[in-house]
């Protein structure tokens, strides 16, 4: 009997990338490959890459160099696949799989094992690809691409095509997941707000969310990132959809800066004022909603005054989650051609904003101490877990909770008393199981 070839998949980046890795895994299994949890046992390694941040790309590049030195056959997938020159400079024999060609990964592995270094960039029909299920969480892409032309963004270059999945396809994936005991559906996208564009069917994001929530079963839905211009355009119907009991009371709206001037120079398709307005309406209609946002610190044209406006925005809005990135010039973007700010200034500003955000997040989370909340257990932690809890879960507001004393099954709802908190989440003590 011939032993199956073993493949190790390493994933970087957002939930959309993680969803692509799910597809890669399923495709490899169907092609007869065996997946392994360590590169040590692998005949080949697939790196599903991310290029949003320069630091991440540098980390991946170093990883590629190490694997190349160890003579490991490599397949490079994800957004970094657009930078063939860099990949081939590190490893001329690596196979490259574009973001539209991920089901070609089995062929690419054969190619990498032969050392041919072929580039696969054909466009595939992703509608026909199944979605692997790993209960209790299932990632489902609803659309790809975006309508923006941000001057700092390389993802648009790596994923240039705009398309939406048919609603019947998405609903079928949801139904299949629920049948296999999925409890959390994560809807992934570069920008969920573009959903419906390009489809002959007249449907938009709020309508899709409502249709998903009509599916029978005990589950929750987490909506992926939506840019401010689309959140503003569909604000009222979006709020109505988020109010459904099956929707996590959570929204991720990246504003990127608190300066109107910098926002315009980034070529963002919204204003900072739009962001203030959206958050205000969201909190009035859904008072307990968790607000997440993204900030880029140190954009080339950002002045000290611009940065202080960003600090004021965070202090005023007080988001529950702030993802802070130090600006890094990305290949092929307009912002890369601009005169860059000194590294020390960017580091100093980033550290200051991070401290402001941590204080806000910590104080907001501390308000939960003493409260009893419903938590869906989603994950078991290794080595007795973070904060001493064996399991972690999510509240209806998508707050992460480390749960002490839980002995049940992943996917169960439990009542938890919050006994501690930090900027990253909550710490709870089990009270009893509950039915939702």
Model-flagged regions — what are they?
Residues 329, 337-436:
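Terminal RNA-binding accessory module
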Residues 8, 13, 139-141, 222, ...:
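Short aromatic/hydrophobic contact patches that present stacked aromatics
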Residues 17, 53-56, 231, 299, ...:
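Alpha-helix N-cap/loop-to-helix initiation residues
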Residues 103, 148, 193, 260-261, ...:
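Glycine-centered loop/turn positions within well-structured domains
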Residues 225, 255-257, 326, 377-379, ...:
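Flexible glycine-/small-residue-rich
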Residues 1-195, 210, 247, 251, ...:
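Proteins enriched for Cys/Gly/acidic motifs involved in redox and nucleic-acid/cofactor modification
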Residues 74-75, 83, 179-303:
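Conserved SAM/AdoMet-binding glycine-rich loop
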Residues 170, 187, 223, 253, ...:
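Conserved, mostly hydrophobic/aromatic
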